[in-house]
Amino acid sequence: MPQHKFLFTSESVSEGHPDKMCDQISDAVLDAHLAQDPHAKVACETVTKTGMIMLCGEITSKAVVDYQVLVRNVIKKIGYDDSSKGFDYKTCNVLVALEQQSPEIAAGVHVDKDSDDVGAGDQGIMFGYATDETEEAMPLTLLLSHKLNRKLHELRRSGELEWVRPDSKTQVTIEYASEGGACVPLRVHTVVISTQHSPDISLDDLRKELIEKVIKAVIPANLIDDKTIYHLNPCGSFIIGGPMGDAGLTGRKIIVDTYGGWGAHGGGAFSGKDPTKVDRSAAYAARWVAKSLVKAGLCRRCLVQVSYAIGVAKPLSVMVFSFGTSALSEEDLLTIVNDNFDLRPGKIIKNLDLKRPIYEPTAENGHFGHNNFPWEQPRNLKISADMLAKSQGPAQPDVIGIAH
């Protein structure tokens, strides 16, 4: 029986949100280098404000990249093709302030090292999370927030909702039941959508179309009831959007990118970083581990933490927490992880095949929960017969007490 009920909320932003624009541009730069030089070292930040994009950071690569063309193509794809929408790919100013990677970092991390023993590109802590509340092993609050944005902009691109502009935000609150540490979605409590729009639609019509064509198309009917609350463009008109409305910067939507506030976050952003940066690759690996444990039925929820020191290949620590949803102890789960996963950066890169130009799509609707990404493919775990038998027993109590 459910132990208690609680509300939890996650948000998402569209590809036309200024911060997400910057994430996509940074990852497009990364992909352009990896396409020509799989060993490229890239740390590219993007800044945007009215009529301006600036690339800054450090890149060491054999690739030749036309940044002017690349940046404008990303902005065009997003849909900013006229200044009335907040940005125009044809007329914006693209500034480039990119330098080479520090030779001190290069010497300490990868120069003259075997590929398996490449050191971590920096110190830091990274987390992975998984939950059995959805098929994707992602929190439903975040999954629905992403899907609302995705549907809204599918309709914009198709012309069915031609009044929609590229910049939007969504937010979903769900009422959950806690069931022995697992989270069971009961109903959608609140939906928030704020979307940029053309001047020629009334707020009443906008709100009706959002309910009929977006919300009802995305959120399962059994999760909606007569008490569900809707805040649709609650601030009123939203005509001025994109970089004209707000400045944008790479790496400012790290909770949208990950688990929507569930689990934990180590603080490092992903976009614009090649996979020797453990902020990115180790966070992907931690998700791979957590999802593999949940999909194997070893626990219903899982949080994994890893930590590194710059230039050191082996993780300093690995932690597995199951929120009291596993018949195995945390020590048992950690043994399974250590037996099945090598979390040195070089091995993560090799096992997940991360030296490929696969990153721009990750910057659009979250880095997790999409089965086309290699870290979303659960590993078939090798588990001893004794451990397997033990895993069929009653769940172990939560003795650590980590929050949602």
Swiss-Prot record:
Keyword Transmembrane on entry: no
Cofactor binding, note field: Binds 2 magnesium ions per subunit. The magnesium ions interact primarily with the substrate.
Binding site for K(+): 45
Pathway(s) served: Amino-acid biosynthesis; S-adenosyl-L-methionine biosynthesis; S-adenosyl-L-methionine from L-methionine: step 1/1
Keywords, ordered alphabetically: ATP-binding, Magnesium, Metal-binding, Nucleotide-binding, One-carbon metabolism, Potassium, Transferase
Binding site for L-methionine: 58, 101, 246, 277
Catalytic activity: L-methionine + ATP + H2O = S-adenosyl-L-methionine + phosphate + diphosphate
Gene Ontology cellular component annotations, sorted alphabetically: cytosol
Binding site for Mg(2+): 11
Single GO MF annotation: ATP binding
Residues noted as binding ATP in the record, renumbered to the chain: 17, 167-169, 235-238, 246, 252-253, 269, 273, 277
EC numbers on record: 2.5.1.6
BP GO annotations: one-carbon metabolic process; S-adenosylmethionine biosynthetic process
Cofactor: Mg(2+); K(+)
Family: Belongs to the AdoMet synthase family.
Extra facts: Protein expression is regulated by post-transcriptional regulation: under rich-diet conditions, mett-10 binds and methylates sams-4 mRNA, directly inhibiting splicing and protein production of S-adenosylmethionine synthase.
Protein task: Catalyzes the formation of S-adenosylmethionine from methionine and ATP. The reaction comprises two steps that are both catalyzed by the same enzyme: formation of S-adenosylmethionine (AdoMet) and triphosphate, and subsequent hydrolysis of the triphosphate.
Protein name: Probable S-adenosylmethionine synthase 4
Source organism per UniProt: Caenorhabditis elegans
Gene name of the record: sams-4
